[in-house]
Every structure is written in C-alpha cells, then in structure tokens.
Amino acid sequence: MKLFPSTSTHASARSERSLKSKMAHICLSATFPLLLLGGGSVGAAEVLENSSSISSESAVANSNITLAAGDLYVSPNGSANNPGTINSPTSLANALTQIAPGKTIYLRGGTYSFSETITIERGNNGTSSQRKNLVAYGSEKPVFDFSAQSFASTNRGLQMFGDYWFVKGLEVKGAGDNGIFIGGSYNRLEQIEAHHNRDTGIQIGRYASTAAKSEWPSYNEVIRSYSHNNYDPDDGEDADGFAAKLTVGPGNVFDGCIAAYNVDDGWDLYSKSDTGAIGVVTIRNSIAFANGATADGTSTSNSDGNGFKLGGEKISVNHIVENSIAFNNKKHGFTYNSNPGSIQMKNNTSWNNGQSNFAFDKGTHIFTNNLSFQGGASDKTSGTDVSSTNVWWKNKKSVNDKGLLASAADFVSLVPSVTRSADGTPILGDFLRLANGSDLIGSGTPSGTNVGAR
C-alpha cells in the first residue's frame, strides 16, 4: 500500500496533558507492505545498510497458534459473560483484568469501536520472564477505533500503566488524545499502526502528575511501528508521530519505526524545566518524513515539522540516534531543539528538509558518519566531528573536512519510496542508497563503514 502522497521550535510541553481528524486516511497496515510517494512496491531490500539489526524478540508467534490453558480470545462482539474461547470470545475489558502473567489475549480481527479509554491499570503487570501478551490472532487485523471520543486531553485510546506487557499487531485510530499512551515500564510494542489520533500517535510519559521521578516509565520498546496523520485540532502544535517527553525515565527505545504526515513532529523528546531532564532515549533504524502537515495538507502556523526533535528548554540529555533517515520534513530533519548536551548522532542520513538537515546550534554533540544532502539551509553542527567522517550541507554543497564531496551521482535514487515488509520493517529500495563507486562507501569510521544510513 502507498505511504507517501508527498510533502519552530516550540514548547511542545503542553503541560501534562497527554498532549493532544480530519485527514485523508493512508492505510499502512502493520502486516502488509505500504508504498510511498509515487514509487511502486519494492522487494524486501534492506532499508538501512549500516543498521544494527532491528530487535525482534516476539513473545508470541503469529502462526501455528495453540491455545494454552489461561489464554483468552477477544472479539469485537465478545461478551464479558463468555469464557474467552475461540467460539465464545470475551470482551477486551474483561480479558485485561483476567489474564495471568505468561498468558496471551488473542485479538480477533475486525473493528473494536470504543467511546471511552481502555486502560491497563497500574499494578496489572507481567514479569520479566512472563509478560502479559495482547496480540493479533494469526494474520487477522484488530482495529481499535476511538473516533466516538470527543477531543480532550483525558480521552486517550489505549493507556498502558502496567509493566511487562507485550502488544503486537494493533491498529489504533481516532482517539480524542494519544492513540497509545505508555505510563508503565518494561513494555514492548511491535507492528503497531497509530493514525488520525488527536494528539501524538504513541507517547511515553508518567501515569499521573503525582508520580515520583523513580516511577517515570522506563525501558519500554516500540518496534517496527508506524504513526501517521495525527492532528490536534486546537492549534496543530502537539500531535507528533512518536514522543518520549516531559516525564520519561531511562532506557526507552524506538527501533525500525516510521513517522510521517504528523501535523507537528515525527519524534519529540522534549524536556521541560518544570519537571527537569528526561532519561536518555535511543532511536535507531527509523524514518521521519513529511511531518509538519497531514497527508491532505492540513497544517497551522504552530506546526513545527521537524523529523527528529531531540530536546527542549536548554536541558542537557545525551540521547542516541543511529541509522535513521529524515527527509521532506517541513522544518529540520534532525534538531537538538536547544538541548546543549552530547547527543550521539551516528550513521544518519538527512535530505531535502525545509530548513537545516541537521540543526545542532550549540552543545558538545558527537557526530559520526552522518550524511546531509540538499537541505533548505546550511547545517549547524556544534560538537565533535569524529575522524572527519561526516558530510554536511554547507553553502549549498555537501562537503566534509577530508575533501569528500557528495552529489546526486552518489545515490542510486533520490525518488522517495518507502514500504514496510510483512513484519513492519521499513524498506526504501534504492532510495538514498549509495551508488557503486561513490566515495562515501567505506569512508566512515571504523574503516570500511559507509557514510550515512544506507
């Protein structure tokens, strides 16, 4: 399926709201390929040549399912009075309170229409060795539709306040605020599609304003998921693709994800002076494009449009971004957003963003093997250029300190094409892939490593 029609640093700290549709629906299934921008579907080529392999420790296989004692089936028409068998499925609300650690709730396909938030309550936990599992049954596609909710900061879709849950294969749309909000720790989400929600598609943040900093959500993983066309109708300033901001602990990871057509930013890692520094977030093997407007062109003067926004309010946090790509975003591709710390930027590619591909005006950031081409403004790169391995867009040229020059000839294709494989892995085909004979191949560090993500 096609993913791409085509394409201000703000205090996105909408104080302690879960942070907040009217877009053309672009269906990007977590289980089917999706296509982008005018390119046809492409084969299962690897997205990011330099990528560390995307984590894939699925707790539950999606084929050859054998129902174990204690597992439960849920369907759109399930009843709390039913036992939760395949022939007599229970309701989701009932299953969430009944499932034991190590057991699985299988979601049958179809549309689950909700007018109220679904909450996995605090204390409803799995364990490190026995997660609680909430997964699509086989190849079926469960869709959680919260369109009946009104726009309000309390009207999230799925709230996860428990620990050690594994959630896979859901589509979540139309929520009055966040599509999915993670307030617990040690949770893992895979192959989620969040779209047309009225705030950020998938956000991590504290479960309540009374939570101590030691209770801030930590060590959550969002894997091979896609968040798009999220739009907050009050001012268009809050709805990002993914966010780990304001009140998150250490160890949260986004791996192999795509954020596109969100009215504000692709990723938002905002820190706020009221609550202090958040924990270090790692983003790898991920893509942000065409953020700052929805697919039908809906935007506001407040819509920032950064691909990866990595800070806020001059607070230092040493985030990590690796093997990721930003292109065609309204504003910057990657921005420090006033974070003066030592963000580690390694093997990223940024192309054709509205302003700077890399905007790191101040700080002691660490840059290794990054590639910038054809930005709207010159890059700003305060920090260390490790072994002079970065190629920056400066004065309308891509250059580096060792004399490398990048041109269109260094790429196999500059025609955007983005799809997802059956397991949600992003695929770019030849887009931004280094061409044979390019001087950028093998010019990074360690010796033999390519410059850029591909």
Residue ranges: model-predicted function:
Residues D71, S75-R108, S113-F114, T119, ...:
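Acidic Gly/Asp/Thr-rich repetitive segments characteristic of extracellular carbohydrate-active
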Residues N87, Y106-G109, N125-G176, Y231:
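Right-handed parallel beta-helix/beta-spiral solenoid domain characteristic of secreted/periplasmic
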